[in-house]
């Protein structure tokens, strides 16, 4: 199988004759793959929303977590290790049940970190961000399924955009200006919105030039999850800075 890692781990060129027998030409395989990915994604989002709700609406828990910074550090280390393992170790992310275990560990750690971050904002801002993120992600998903434009060829452009965003973010840390912060958050929300369309089309396969392998269901769910939580955090940042 000729994997095209320039387009993401586990991706391949759908026009490569070596993979024609293993692509998504079988509708039942494609539908089953998509159902599995979205089922995993829903569980991840439910866990994450649980942490956000707990840390935003339970004062004692919020106070304990904010007074115990070591919990945040441990969760951050666990999240990074789990994410690197899933991204770089193909045998781990393709083999059940270890792939589910690693994804669960990652989701718990990431959910906790997001809950801590969200708890620094006002409750109504968090609720507004959840609502806007839900609407945006549903609209983008429908767009990804319906549009004739193939976003799977934008992997290189999106990678450059993320690098620019990272550099911009470092600069924004030292420039305490409301406009700069709003521009940074808006750019982040835009980039990860495009990434959501890109990752959705990779999962869909079919007529798109690049697809993610059917055995990469955990990796596909991880990609979509990261897109959604990044969109949420950037939208939350936009709301927070707009109210300052």
Segments and roles (model prediction):
Residues 1-244:
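A hydrophobic alpha-helical transmembrane-helix feature that marks the membrane cores
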């Amino acid at each position: 199988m000729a994997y095209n890692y320039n387009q993401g781990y586990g991706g391949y060129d759908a026009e490569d004759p070596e993979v024609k027998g293993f692509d998504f030409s079988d509708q039942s395989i494609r539908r089953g793959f998509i159902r599995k990915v979205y089922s995993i994604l829903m569980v991840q989002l439910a866990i994450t929303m649980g942490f956000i709700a707990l840390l935003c609406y339970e004062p004692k828990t919020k106070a304990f977590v904010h007074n115990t910074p070591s919990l945040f550090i441990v969760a951050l280390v666990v999240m990074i290790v789990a994410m690197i393992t899933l991204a770089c170790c193909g045998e781990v992310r393709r083999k059940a049940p270890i792939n589910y275990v690693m994804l669960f560990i990652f989701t718990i750690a990431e959910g906790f970190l997001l809950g801590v971050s969200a708890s620094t904002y006002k409750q109504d801002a968090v609720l507004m961000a959840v609502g806007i993120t839900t609407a945006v992600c549903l609209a983008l998903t429908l767009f990804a399924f319906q549009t004739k434009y193939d976003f799977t060829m934008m992997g290189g452009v999106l990678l450059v955009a993320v690098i620019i965003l990272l550099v911009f973010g470092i600069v924004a840390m030292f420039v305490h200006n409301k406009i700069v912060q709003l521009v940074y958050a808006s750019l982040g929300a835009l980039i990860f919105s495009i990434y959501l369309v890109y990752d959705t089309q990779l999962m869909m396969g079919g007529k798109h030039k690049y697809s993610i392998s059917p055995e990469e269901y955990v990796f596909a769910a991880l990609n979509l999850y990261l897109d959604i939580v990044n969109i949420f955090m950037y939208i939350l940042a936009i709301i927070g800075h707009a109210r300052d």
